[in-house]
């Protein structure tokens, strides 16, 4: 979300060329809105060739299938966020094994971009059940994924996971 007014002094921001890009900047003080990405995690768990997805219960993309995950808290390590989000959304305790990759993608129709850190994790406990902002959870074969995947970054992540497991 871009600022209209300076959060330091209240002046209206103006567009200014800074570091080779047009950025909202304050004409009275040193504030520049760099419009940084928001960090998120996604967690892929595979069991017997099937990956766990959640059906979103909130916007954006309510009713679409989603990789379990969410935004990091300001003081949270991404691996800890992965564990927390999996427990909240699926009831499962997981241990992140590796980072599959990173993707930058728009967060629905919002005016910000998200940096999605996608983990592969293994289940270490809990009971699989939909929680917090999930309507339901389901295990899908990696070769028969649903068409209605929520975010643009998720299909390449699922394809990368599928290709890695084939090798």
Which residues does each predicted region cover?
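Residues immediately within or flanking Cys/His clusters that coordinate Zn2+
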Residues: 3, 23
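Conserved N-terminal beta-strand and adjoining loop/helix that marks the start
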Residues: 28-51
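Active-site-adjacent beta-strand/loop module that shapes the phosphate/pyrophosphate-binding cleft
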Residues: 103-127
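A short coil-to-beta-strand element that immediately follows conserved catalytic motifs
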Residues: 16-17, 92-101
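Conserved Nudix-box catalytic region and its N-terminal flanking loop in Nudix hydrolases
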Residues: 46-88
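Short cysteine-rich clusters marking metal-coordination/redox-active sites
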Residues: 6-9, 26-29
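Nudix hydrolase/Nudix homology domain
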Residues: 2, 130-167
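Short functional micro-motifs and their immediate structural scaffolds
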Residues: 14-15, 34
């Amino acid at each position: 979300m871009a600022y209209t007014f300076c959060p330091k002094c209240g002046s209206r921001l103006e567009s200014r060329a800074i570091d080779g890009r047009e950025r909202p900047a304050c004409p009275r003080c040193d504030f520049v809105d760099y419009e940084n990405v928001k960090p998120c995690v996604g967690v892929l768990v595979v069991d017997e060739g099937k990956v766990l997805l959640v059906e979103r219960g909130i916007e954006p993309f309510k009713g679409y299938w989603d990789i379990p995950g969410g935004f990091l808290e300001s003081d949270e390590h991404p691996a800890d966020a992965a564990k927390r989000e999996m427990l909240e959304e699926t009831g499962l305790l997981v241990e992140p094994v590796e980072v599959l990759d990173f993707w930058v993608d728009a967060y629905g129709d919002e005016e910000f971009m998200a940096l999605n850190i996608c983990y592969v994790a293994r289940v270490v406990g809990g009971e699989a059940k939909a929680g917090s902002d999930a309507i339901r959870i389901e295990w899908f074969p990696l070769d028969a994924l649903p068409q209605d995947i929520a975010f643009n970054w998720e299909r390449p992540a699922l394809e990368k996971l599928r290709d890695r497991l084939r090798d």
